[in-house]
Amino acid sequence: MKIALTCMCSLLLTFCAMSQNTEMKLPAPQKTGGMPLMEALSKRATNRSLDPARSLSDQQLSNLLWAAWGINRPDGRRTAASAMNRQEIDLYLVGRKAAYLYDAKEHSLKLVAEGDHRSEVSSQDFAKNGDWIVIFAADYDKMGGGNEA
């Protein structure tokens, strides 16, 4: 597991080193409406039969990223808690055409690598058929423990 995580992080760092200043601004997230939480939890299930022809709309992607790691308060705090508010997580999206880093402050995607790198970041065949692979990567330096983890 540590080897796989190390390889994935190395690949992401390589993507970052190759990055261009290309940015994709996302639409504002829809913060009201939707399915009630308890209903969503009761319907939650894993589906490994992914249709490669289906894709998320920009609005769906915006909502998903904001819910996962967006900023929901004026002081910059997030929708998801982090220990001691260190905000050590980076969220990456790897898709058919490119890999991106989610910039929560700008609610945008920053290009880190062109091309389809899904097979390089997942060993699970079903994931390669999905529209996006979401990667949460922790910056150990922000955690206060350095490389101890």
Tell where the protein language model's regions lie, with residue ranges.
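Bacterial N-terminal signal peptides
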Residues: 6-15
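Positively charged n-region of N-terminal signal peptides that target proteins for export
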Residues: 1-5
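Amphipathic, heptad-repeat alpha-helical segments used for oligomerization and assembly
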Residues: 141-149
